């Protein structure tokens, strides 16, 4: 069967609007079905024996979320934070001020030893990014 789809409620219109989901800007008209579950942030998502804390992390897009697996000190962070960089904030639905808040108040409140797995690129840790990421150290 189909896998269940989860999406943050701030991106509710992205499913049906190619300009909001940015496919329209790339010459495509991609739409998708509504998700099976809407996220708000603050939930616990259980997959098999693994529990993930869902944290709302807007900036790159209004509905970015982190999936934090506290038991293993790892997190899936999408395009919020990369090794040495951050997610783009020049898209029409991005918000630089919300990204700044997410990085300063959400990401940097996480423990240094937390391994983060971005949407693409190598894994890193919060501590490594706190020490060396120019967007964390110097802002943007």
Q: What residue ranges belong to the model's regions?
A:
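A structural signal for short coil/turn segments at secondary-structure junctions
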Residues: 1, 110-111
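Active-site HxH/HxHxD metal-binding segment of metal-dependent hydrolases
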Residues: 1-46, 50, 131-138
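Active-site neighborhood of phospho(di)ester-bond hydrolases with catalytic His/Asp-centered motifs
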Residues: 5-8, 54-59, 76-78, 115-120
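Divalent metal-binding pocket/active-site signature
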Residues: 13, 68, 120
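Short, active-site-adjacent cap segments at secondary-structure transitions
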Residues: 13-14, 123-127
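Phosphate-coordinating loops and pocket residues in cytosolic domains that bind phosphorylated ligands
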Residues: 17, 101, 128
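Catalytic core of the metallo-beta-lactamase
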Residues: 30-109, 125, 137-138
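Charged phosphate-binding loop/patch that engages nucleotide di/tri-phosphates or the phosphate backbone
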Residues: 112-116, 127-128, 136
């Amino acid at each position: 069967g189909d896998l269940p789809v989860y999406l943050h409620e701030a991106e509710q219109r992205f499913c049906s609007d190619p300009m909001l989901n940015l496919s329209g800007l790339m010459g495509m008209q991609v739409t998708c079905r509504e998700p099976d579950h809407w996220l708000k942030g603050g939930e616990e998502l259980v997959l098999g024996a693994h529990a993930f804390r869902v944290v709302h992390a807007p900036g790159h897009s209004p509905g970015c979320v982190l999936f934090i697996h506290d038991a293993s000190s790892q997190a899936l962070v999408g395009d919020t934070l990369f090794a040495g960089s951050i997610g783009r904030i020049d898209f029409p639905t991005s918000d630089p001020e919300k990204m700044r808040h997410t990085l300063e108040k959400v990401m940097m409140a996480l423990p240094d030893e937390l391994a983060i797995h971005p949407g693409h690129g190598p894994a890193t840790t919060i501590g490594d990014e706190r020490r060396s990421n120019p967007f964390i150290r110097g802002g943007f």
